[in-house]
């Protein structure tokens, strides 16, 4: 495994479980690099949508990924030199990304891009297969989850802050459908591995969850 001596914390879990926010804050607390794997798939989705490639066109989508010009710097995510940090968070982009994430060829194409981000002093990576596929030798693997209602409320809050209206009932159904699609896909399905620690964040605030993750990392014996 490339750079196997560099510590890695993986946070996997379903959509709206809070893994992105928690991973970013944990990386800041430890001074580690941060990998938002979902952003890579959303970037492919956005690029494909802009070029009129249908989500059902696997070869077309993989071709887009192969020539993807992206950069992560200064808290911004850039596609072809343009900041698309907000654009990739749109629901339509997320739905497209969820559909194309089932393609084995696409996951292979993005595999090394993700592993190349494993650099000193360490990495915190969030996604759905970070601990099971991308970094199976991670120092600490956590499966982050929350009940459907809590996740729907979090997603609703995110959308409202962006001026996007959505009903919680609709979001519950959308999350349920996405969970089923993510867990049943053939390529790297969403699952909790045997060596992954479960962290249910239902009823917990952000600081509490970050504290628990940092505590787990300290307990792993990786902090000297």
UniProtKB/Swiss-Prot annotation:
A biological process term (GO) from this entry: pyrimidine nucleotide metabolic process
EC code(s) of this entry: 2.7.4.25
Catalysed reactions, semicolon-separated: CMP + ATP = CDP + ADP; dCMP + ATP = dCDP + ADP
Lineage top rank: taxon: Bacteria
Cellular localisation: Cytoplasm
GO cellular component, one term: cytoplasm
Keywords: ATP-binding, Cytoplasm, Kinase, Nucleotide-binding, Transferase
GO molecular function, a single term: ATP binding
Signal peptide: none
Residues binding ATP, per UniProt: 13-21
One Pfam family this sequence matches: Cytidylate_kin
Similarity remark: Belongs to the cytidylate kinase family. Type 1 subfamily.
Protein name: Cytidylate kinase
